[in-house]
């Protein structure tokens, strides 16, 4: 029995190692042509279904990127364009794209020493949402790699994302995540804007890296 258990553990470790090695950043770079029209333009603003700057994803964790794309594909995140794109991707495509975007800012650690302290009102709201317990004290080091880095992300995107967790019965806007829905719903829109405005000012590892469609 002990030998069987040891074998199963070894096989599981091998499988996890293989999955990690299966992410190919070079392949992801070639597959990113469909992404750079929005995510490769600094400050690019979406106009449908809502108006906001598309998120910076260079430097975001690969497991989070995979999680987000999977949620779009399943319909847990509602966005017509992103769902269509995610539906066209295989699991391998997602892994490769995530690896490419994660490594684009490797070595560019956020300088947390320059982070401004939140105002008393914002500090109270962050405490109310218990935000740091998952996203990390500096909001750049989430406790789980499938959670996003928030520091320095565009305020209007963060606001739209949090507002989406409050949205029900809308075929084009909304996010289905029980934990985040429970956290976001007690906040007013004004409170969400205070929180996201502060998060956007923090030192960040996230960037938009301009890229050409022609490679």
Where would I find each of the regions flagged by the language model?
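Extracytoplasmic c-type cytochrome modules immediately beyond a signal peptide or single-pass transmembrane anchor
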Residues: 51, 62-116
């Amino acid at each position: 029995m002990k030998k069987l258990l040891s074998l199963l553990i070894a096989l599981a470790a091998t499988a996890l190692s293989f999955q990690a090695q299966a992410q190919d950043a070079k392949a992801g770079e070639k597959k990113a042509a469909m992404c750079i029209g929005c995510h490769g333009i600094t400050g690019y603003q979406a106009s449908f279904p809502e108006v906001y700057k598309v998120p910076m994803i260079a430097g975001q964790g690969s497991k989070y990127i995979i999680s987000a794309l999977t949620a779009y594909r399943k319909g847990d995140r509602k966005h017509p364009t992103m769902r269509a794109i995610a539906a066209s991707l295989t699991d391998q495509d997602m892994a490769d794209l995530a690896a490419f975007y994660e490594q684009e800012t490797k070595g560019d650690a956020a300088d947390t020493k320059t982070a401004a302290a939140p105002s008393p009102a914002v500090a109270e709201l962050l405490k109310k949402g218990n935000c740091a317990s998952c996203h990390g004290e500096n909001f750049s080091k989430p406790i789980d790699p499938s959670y996003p880095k928030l520091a320095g992300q565009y305020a209007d995107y963060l606001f739209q994302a949090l507002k989406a967790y409050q949205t029900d019965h809308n075929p084009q806007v909304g996010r289905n995540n029980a934990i985040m829905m429970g956290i976001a719903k007690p906040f007013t829109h004004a409170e969400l804007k205070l929180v996201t405005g502060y998060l956007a000012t923090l030192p960040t590892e996230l960037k938009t890296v301009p890229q050409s469609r022609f490679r």
